[in-house]
Structure formats: structure tokens, C-alpha cells
Amino acid sequence: MTKIKIVVIVGPTAVGKTALGISLAKAFNGEIISGDSQQVYRQLDIGTAKATQEEQEAAVHHLTDIREVTESYSAYDFVQDAQKAISDIVSRGKLPIIVGGTGLYLQSLLEGYHLGGQVDQEAVKAYRNELEQLDDHDLYERLQVNNITIEQVNRRRAIRALELAQFADELENAETAYEPLIIGLNDDRQVIYDRINQRVDRMLENGLLEEAKWLYEHYPTVQASRGIGYKELFPYFVGEMTLAEASDQLKQNTRRFAKRQLTWFRNRMAVSFTAITAPDYPQVVHDRVRDFLGQKEKS
């Protein structure tokens, strides 16, 4: 079976994945697939760091604005949607470029979690429904029985982990349809932290507070509201924090999230990282993609 070549850009939040994705899309006739669990939601643009209108005009983006904030979204959903997007992009002779920071989503796609021929999807759905009926105590016991330890346990993450454990044998035997070039972006910790702090400041200047307040007033308990970028501002709305304190909390949580992202990518994916402050950074990445695609450099 000839595998489909795809480019996957990973790295901590605020490192510049979107900008690189657009640059590669322009250079290699590509289209971008968002691999971010929060960017699927309509009306949540600023806090999710969704590509701006100008950026979306520069390159076609898929899997953004495909769910209402009241809807849930899982790794299983992402894999099904990403499969369809990849097939569509390839059918038009273009290069799929996945840009994302949700490690479980990317791993599920790249390691065969999506293959209906190998994994009984009806069994997956039935098992998920069974888990969703459990209360938190019973769900936690299931994690212990399966020797699963996950950081910051919540129901959504616990169910995902149990699904992967339950169908591990099928997943190990599944053959992915894709040949990925995984490009990792990173830099010194302080460089990343400074970029995060600056981006949070820009988000607040551009209307994040209003976006978060709308979510808090209308849908404070939905899955989308639990994402970093919104829940940190909720205490400000009820007078439990000053805006400065809430902003600092958001920056701190985002920095911690970036650290967890890097840990995930280093431990779970075969990725070589490139420093974004290296003088030859853009050219090095473009050369890697060109070699991957078997193209010659234009004179």
C-alpha cells in the first residue's frame, strides 16, 4: 500500500506553528488541518489562538469552526474528521499539513487509531458509552485496574486513556495509511515563556475578556469552557480575582501546558526539534519538506 505523505507541525503553544504552516502551504501547494482540540469550536477564536481571517485567506484551513460550544469533541471524532480532510486535500493534488498541539489527537491519527478495518468502531462506541455511565469514583477505579496514571485527571481524558488501553492489541496491529514528516518547533524555555506572556497580553487587548465572559455567562460548564484561556478568567467575573491576577494565572497555566506538550511530543512521537531563533530556521524546515517530497529546489 502506498502511504499518503503528510507534514505534521508540533511544538508548544505560542511557538509559531501556524505561521510555519502557512509558509509551507504557500511553498508546497498545501492546505492546513488544525490538530487542536479547542479550535473546532465556533465563536471561540481569540482564546484558542485560531488562525485569523487574514491567515485563513493566506492558506485553506480545515477542522476549525466545525462544532458548537455545546458539543463535545474527542480524539475519535478528530481522527474521523482528519481522515476525510486528508482524503479531500490529496484528491485535489495538494499536500496535507497538520498543525497542532493536542498530542493525543495526533498520535491517534498517526498510529492507526482510525482504521475501521482493524478496530471495531461499534465496539469502541459501546465501550465509550459504558464508561460515560460510570461515576467519577468508578471511573478512577477503572484507571487503577488498568495501571493508568494520567496528569490532572478529568473524565474526558480518563475515558480516552481507557479506550486506548482497551483496544491496545488492535491498535498495535493496525497499519497507518500515512507517511508523516513530523517537524518540531521549540527553543530555550525563556524564549517560549516570553512568547506565551506576550501572546496572552495581545489576546486580552484583542477581546479575550469579552469572549471569555460570553462563554461564562452562557455555557460555563461545557467541555469548551474547560480549555486554557477561558477558565482562568472566570474567577475575575465573580470578584474572586483581580484582572491582573487572572491574567497572571492564565500565563502560568499556559506555560505549564507548554511544558506538558513538550513532554508528550518527546515521549510519544519521533520528532526532531528545530529552534525558532536559529538564523537558518525557515530554510532548514523548507529543505526538509522538499527532501521529504522528493522535490528539487527551484533555481
Swiss-Prot record:
Top enzyme category: transferase
Site features described as Interaction with substrate tRNA, chain residue numbers: T102, R128
Cofactor(s) this protein requires: Mg(2+)
GO biological-process terms attached to the record: tRNA modification
The EC number(s) this enzyme carries: 2.5.1.75
Reactions it catalyzes: adenosine(37) in tRNA + dimethylallyl diphosphate = N(6)-dimethylallyladenosine(37) in tRNA + diphosphate
Region (Interaction with substrate tRNA): 36-39
Family stated for the protein in its record: Belongs to the IPP transferase family.
Protein name from the UniProt record: tRNA dimethylallyltransferase
Name of the gene this protein is made from: miaA
